[in-house]
Amino acid sequence: YTLAPFRYHMLRGIDFYRHAQDTLRSLPNVTFLQAPVESVQDGSQHAQVTAGGQTYAAEWVFNSLFRSSEFKITDPRYQDDKQHFTGWEIETETDVFNPQCPTMFDFRTPQHGVMRFVYILPFSPRQALVEYTLFSADLLPPAEYDLALKSYIQDVLKLTHYRIQAEESGVIPMTDQPFPRRTGQRILNIGTIGGRVKPSTGYAFLR
């Protein structure tokens, strides 16, 4: 099956962030500050952010603070599922992958009562991202994601010799609960906390 004239593109978060930061650093009116945010307070004329022991005031604050461990669905009317995943970028000793043919939903992995699948994004005949993904209300112990990946690579891809070049993991809320666009007169939520996760796929930027 061909996607023509469409194409599937993989956008690495780190590449996007570097591009955005390089652009912003070139602007004379932008200053970067890296510090833990201690509080965000709303006001009628301005909002205040306290970070690293200092308080900063602005007419508008764009809030992207989101911690999946603290996100809870308390209203029974809404779904409380999560999309959670671990992926490995692997390199093989022989040609294995077709760079023109990604695998999007491979359900040849034990389901254990919830939807689980693996997708493969090949970069070259010997390099690919192999990602184990599932939808459930509860997360797995970290070792279980690794075990599922090892089993899939061995049993389905028939690979025993490969190198793990990079790893990634994440948790994305998959809920129909409305996300407030504002948390005050002067505070606007963006990113995941602003409800900007694509509902059909879970694709999103955390911040």
What is each PLM-predicted segment?
Residues Y1-A35:
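Dinucleotide-binding Rossmann-like beta1-alpha1 core, especially the glycine-rich loop
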Residues T2, V130, V197-K198:
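Short small-residue beta-strand/loop micro-motif enriched in glycine and branched aliphatics
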Residues A128, N189-I193:
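Short acidic (Asp/Glu) and glycine-rich catalytic loops that position anionic groups and cofactors
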Residues H112-M115, S169-I190, P199:
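FAD-binding beta-loop-beta segment adjacent to the flavin cofactor pocket
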Residues I193-R207:
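A conserved FAD-binding loop/helix module that cradles the flavin
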Residues P5-H9, L134-L139, T201:
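Short histidine-centered catalytic/ligand-binding loop motif
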Residues T23-R163, T175-P180:
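Predominantly flavin-linked oxidoreductase catalytic cores and closely associated redox partners
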Residues Q165-E167:
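Long, charged, glycine-rich C-terminal linkers/tails
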